[in-house]
């Protein structure tokens, strides 16, 4: 007698189909996760760097230096675009615009180059010249100051990298230093009084108002999203 086992074969086929579907789902999930990590990781690294420099800046005397972090200003020219500044230090000696980078390895670049190079673990990566990036921040600050009646206030550009970075950079218009040298750099540039204590308070409040506006905008956007959901 011949025994027919079609039901068993069909069952095996379905099990294989389910297994393959599961494998495909896992592959797609891992692909999506890898994309998310690739996008989010630089953001996390950037925020870690900003937090480290923000903590170091607290070493500055609070009666002489006012610190405002993560400020969004309108770009120069009064258009609708904006620019985000990691740290602004306001003092009677002028204003310091600090751009924080969390890139390790060897950093090579010049003041006028469009891109700089990071060399690490035998690989080279290009990134935007942070001096150019901070120049846009300086111009935005100048525009904001002019609109509030402040002319010719010195604004110093500082670019900060981690302590274990090797810097091979030539620059005159900006100070390119390591995180641990940021405070001393600010102090070394603090040689001529150009603003009154009252001016420092007013400018700081203007920057903090911008921060409050940014927070309100984020809350408003979140509320809109919640309504849509």
Model-identified regions with their sequence ranges:
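Surface-exposed interaction regions that form or flank ligand-binding interfaces
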Residues: 13-83, 90-95, 104-106, 115, ...
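Acidic/histidine-enriched active-site and ligand-binding environments that engage anionic O-linkages
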Residues: 108-110
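Short, Lys/Arg-enriched N-terminal segments with co-localized hydrophobic residues
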Residues: 1-19
């Amino acid at each position: 007698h011949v025994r027919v086992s079609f039901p068993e074969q069909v069952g095996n086929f379905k099990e294989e189909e389910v297994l393959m579907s599961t494998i495909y789902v896992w592959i797609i999930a891992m692909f999506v996760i890898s994309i998310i990590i690739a996008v989010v990781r630089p953001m996390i690294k950037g925020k870690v760097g900003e937090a480290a420099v923000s903590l170091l800046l607290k070493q500055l005397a609070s009666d002489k230096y006012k610190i405002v972090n993560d400020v969004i200003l309108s770009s120069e020219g009064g258009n609708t675009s904006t620019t985000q500044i990691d740290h602004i230090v306001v003092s009677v000696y002028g204003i310091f615009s600090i751009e924080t980078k969390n890139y390790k390895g060897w950093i090579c670049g010049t003041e006028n180059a469009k891109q700089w190079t990071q060399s690490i673990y035998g690989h080279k990566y290009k990134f935007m010249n942070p001096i150019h990036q901070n120049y846009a921040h300086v111009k935005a600050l100048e525009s904001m100051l002019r609109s509030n009646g402040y002319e010719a206030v010195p604004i110093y550009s500082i670019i900060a990298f981690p302590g274990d970075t090797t810097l091979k950079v030539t620059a005159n218009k900006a100070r390119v230093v390591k995180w641990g040298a940021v405070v001393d750099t600010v102090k070394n540039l603090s040689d001529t009084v150009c603003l009154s204590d009252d001016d420092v308070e007013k400018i700081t409040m203007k920057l903090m108002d911008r921060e409050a506006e940014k927070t309100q905008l984020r809350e408003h956007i979140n509320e809109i999203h919640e309504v849509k959901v």
